[in-house]
């Protein structure tokens, strides 16, 4: 459960404001837009807002060089309704998405290797009669991409990315499925690949191992990295003569606390040598965790690394001068899956 819906918005703006008279005489190109939304991170999780334990140099640089919105609030304290307020522009009291209602309850199960998963997954759909952000921007000439968590409709509903103005999608249709960082499948919609609807892309290496227990960590296809790489590949295909908008809705640092055992994690394991463990909660798809503090801190530093890679890609492509980058969280900090906000002094 999230303690607060207060969030942090940072913008890195690569286009200068021009005098009105000059704008009237000169055709100013539409700015590209990247909207980076992480999951269950409070403003107190960032070094630029006083976090003493977690290293976030790239986001800190955004804060120094861009603009901070210190009185910004998320639309809701949980995933689906918070995203609904963003996508619809409605107050949460006006949109009918009021919670993380799951549409997989009672549906048949399908087999993925030795694992069973739901035949249909997702949340309450957005009203198809109400225009949402990707549709609005597409109507204004933008190429649109969404990478990460959707939570705006269930598979086969009237509100999946392919029906809502999105040219390319890769990630989780369902917020509950995103509780597994090593999932059985991810969802995809790509016109370039010939998709006519959202499909499932099976994680063939993952399904060779169980979803729960010690052997779960033998799974190697880490969704956060896979989704981020898909976003970078999409960004690499963009050109300066066609405006684009990308919604990169990262699942980090939402529970479960799981990630590759690499140098990012090892550094925090050394830092928090005396650490906590957590026993897991299978009903919510949270596996048991050791080194909970190190895991959580490493997830945020990993996210920060991804942000740095995005800025590097923009510069490499020569797109950094005409791209607005916005960074925020869907809501405040969480206590799920072994996370310990009190240890980090988080808000």
Where does each model-flagged region fall?
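Active-site-proximal cap/lid insertion segments
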Residues: 28-31, 38-53, 70, 100-102, ...
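Amphipathic alpha-helical recognition patches that constitute DNA-binding helices
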Residues: 32, 58, 132, 161, ...
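Active-site segment of extracytoplasmic enzymes that catalyze sulfate/phosphate-ester chemistry
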Residues: 24, 43-132, 136, 142-145, ...
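Bacterial Sec-dependent N-terminal signal peptides
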Residues: 1-29
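Residues embedded in well-ordered beta-strands
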Residues: 32-34, 85
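Conserved beta-strand elements of the Class I
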Residues: 34, 143-145, 246
């Amino acid at each position: 459960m999230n303690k607060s819906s207060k969030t942090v918005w940072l913008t890195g703006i690569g286009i200068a404001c021009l005098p009105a008279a000059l704008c009237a005489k000169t055709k100013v190109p539409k700015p590209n837009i990247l909207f980076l939304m992480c999951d269950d991170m409070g403003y107190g999780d960032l070094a630029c807002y006083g976090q003493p334990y977690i290293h976030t140099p790239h986001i800190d640089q955004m804060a120094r060089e861009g603009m901070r919105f210190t009185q910004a609030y998320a639309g809701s304290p949980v995933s689906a309704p918070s995203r609904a307020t963003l996508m619809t522009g409605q107050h949460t009291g006006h949109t009918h998405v009021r919670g993380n209602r799951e549409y997989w309850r009672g549906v048949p199960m399908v087999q993925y290797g030795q694992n069973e998963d739901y035949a249909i997954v997702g949340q309450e759909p957005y009203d198809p009669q109400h225009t949402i952000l990707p549709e609005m921007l597409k109507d204004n000439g933008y190429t649109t991409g969404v990478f990460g968590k959707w939570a705006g409709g269930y598979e086969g509903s009237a509100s999946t990315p392919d029906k809502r103005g999105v040219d390319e999608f890769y990630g989780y249709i369902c917020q509950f499925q995103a509780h597994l960082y090593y999932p059985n499948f991810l969802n995809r919609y790509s016109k370039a690949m010939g998709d006519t609807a959202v499909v499932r892309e099976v994680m063939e290496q993952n399904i060779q191992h169980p979803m729960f227990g010690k052997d779960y960590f033998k799974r190697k296809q880490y969704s956060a990295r896979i989704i981020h790489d898909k976003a970078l590949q999409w960004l690499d295909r963009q050109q300066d003569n066609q405006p684009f908008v990308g919604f990169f809705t990262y699942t980090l640092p939402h529970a479960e606390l799981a990630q590759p055992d690499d140098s990012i994690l090892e550094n925090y394991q050394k830092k928090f040598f005396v650490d906590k463990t957590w026993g897991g909660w299978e009903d919510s798809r949270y596996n048991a965790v050791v080194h909970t503090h190190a895991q959580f801190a490493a997830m945020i530093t990993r996210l920060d690394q991804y942000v740095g890679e995005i800025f590097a890609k923009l510069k490499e492509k020569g797109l950094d001068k005409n791209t607005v980058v916005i960074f925020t969280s869907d809501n405040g900090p969480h206590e799920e899956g072994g996370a310990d906000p009190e240890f980090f002094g988080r808000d």
